């Protein structure tokens, strides 16, 4: 080979080693399956129907519409395929670019990752059966790669060799799916090819089945090709070191040589028959293991050199929720192993994405097998399969998280190793010679015989196994001794645990008892708070009643004054006006009878001299009686005054009774405030409570901390002293604050009592004066009535005596005329008298109207029945309620931090209802009530002027 070609190849390899590529990540979302449709689970994943956008959105909240879009999480990947994307599109977009690199000599890997029942196996294998020698539309990536591989190889003239293997990782155990012998001695082991020694070839087993008809030279040409071969055995160590650039080597795995796509499909179907599958509640054909289908390509690239490239097609088992899948016993163990390996794979992805120093590849066999594919020297594509249903939202989010992080992993792809044709032929020839010698030895003897060299290899293997057995025995003995020590430690730990559990149970019972006490205390405080609220309402009601009574009293006094002063004054003025009218009318008309009497006297001068004195006296007396005799108005006035007196007396009695009741209520309230409000047994209750808490703390301290009795006792004494002093100071301060806040209220109540007493005294004085005035009026009216009756009797007597004399004079015409004139004038006087009587009757009606207005005012100004009933009901409820001191419940000890969970109590226990009360009650002065409004609900608020 020329030197410049060697230099060019070396520089190309260095450039390839320095190039870094990210892992290609694709997301495939299937449609909802029958189980999800039956469960009526909504779609929470937003993807294109086929492909297009590179973003996947998932809504993990219960919101819809714009809010759901705003709160949804979006993941960006390289490719996104929706439910309508078919198998051919997946292969064309994801697997075909890697296949082209595989043909160029790069190592490539395709991984399918996701939860169970999302279509991983369908994506990787699909329908692997052939129909008339052709693939179906549902065929997956592996069958399509098989056909495309041989189509591409047949289109070239170069020599090639294709081998394939199929391994399974089940419960962290490797298994060869193409091995039908099930030989337990051929356990698959994982080695790093860089750490293997060339001298260990004898310990390596064959990678192909021992079948005599499978030997051939291993080459395949396009035109001259030997008969088909099923399998060929190659040397273990030297071949792997020279063939592959990978650092991971699986010992004892069988590799089958295939010459066309049909044989590759048969190998795939053979392995699928041995794969572990089972039925769960989430999937009828659930894969219970991870599988890796590997295709090895030896392709002639330059004369006698062959380029070795490898493609790993990985079908990972799906993660599953054991409670939802219904896995039990063996299935639960399988699910645990699957989840554990996938969890390790997730940690590896996170470490690689975060560029951590330590990558936990060796924590799981799965991650060790994928060490080259993740962060190694291969080109890798990851297909994440997800479900769109809401019931799988958590698993979908986890899958998308891993896929998004895997996108940041960088690999350094390198071309596969070069192998000389002579080395490849020499390895195949040595394998054929070894198989031939074993076959001849077996054929010439009755039993199974082998050559000396082969026997020596087996002896060496036996010695190595014996050495390993001895080392294992020593390890077993050391582990047994360690196990015994651990058992002793475990027994001691169990005893300590039982002791601690008993203590914890006692503490839990104590805590429950204390919680019950706290509940009782909370109940008592709630009742006390309710009582305080009711007393506040009663206080506000009483204040409103006092205010209404004051307003009613002022209005009543003003209305009575207005009625009495204005009514009587107007009546007096109208009376004077009427009397003046009568006087004027009497003076205007010539009503004097002196002229008539003089005429009669002159006429009867001779005959009436004997009775002149009596007639004159009678006339004078009559005129005097007419002027002085009271009319019917005086009688009605007397009756009206009597009725007014009785009404005033009844009103005075009613008002006195009401004021007496108010005064008694105020006296009772003052007595309660002075004797009972602040003289309760708060201090005694606190002392008893503190003493019981102190005894409880002391007893618990003696039981739990017996070795620290003296220190705990001193601490408890000091704590008790501090707590007692602080509680006493707090109680005294509360009582002083309550007294200082209530003192203005008490002063105003005392002042209101004084005002009520003054009002009562003024009312009694007014009643006495009005009664005395009315009595004087009645006496005067009685005296005038009596004198009028005497005068009337005298006039009647004289009239009777004069009647006889008048009869004697009735025959005289002139006398008749004069008498007629006198009668006319007398009639006129009677008319005037009747007018006066009518006027006085109308005046009496005015007095009646005045009396009705006074009664109406009294009725309107009387307190409403509803207010009286509400106040009486409230006072009856307060008097009927018996207040008892709060019972002591003991002191709550400090809660210990326990290892096991204790049921948390409701947070309302720690919130005392007494603390929520507003004790800053403000009593509004009557002087300032004009500037303050009382709301319908809530405390008084000042007006903004």
From Swiss-Prot:
Organism listed in the record: Eremothecium gossypii (strain ATCC 10895 / CBS 109.51 / FGSC 9923 / NRRL Y-1056) (Yeast)
Record's protein name: Kinesin-like protein CIN8
Gene Ontology terms for molecular function: ATP binding; microtubule binding; minus-end-directed microtubule motor activity; plus-end-directed microtubule motor activity
Domain of life: Eukaryota
Name of the gene: CIN8
Compositionally biased tracts (Low complexity): 193-208
Compositional bias annotation for Polar residues: 234-243
Protein task: Elongates the mitotic spindle by interacting with spindle microtubules to generate an outward force pushing spindle poles apart. Following spindle assembly, CIN8 and KIP1 apparently act to oppose a force, possibly generated by KAR3, that draws separated poles back together.
Binding site for ATP: 114-121
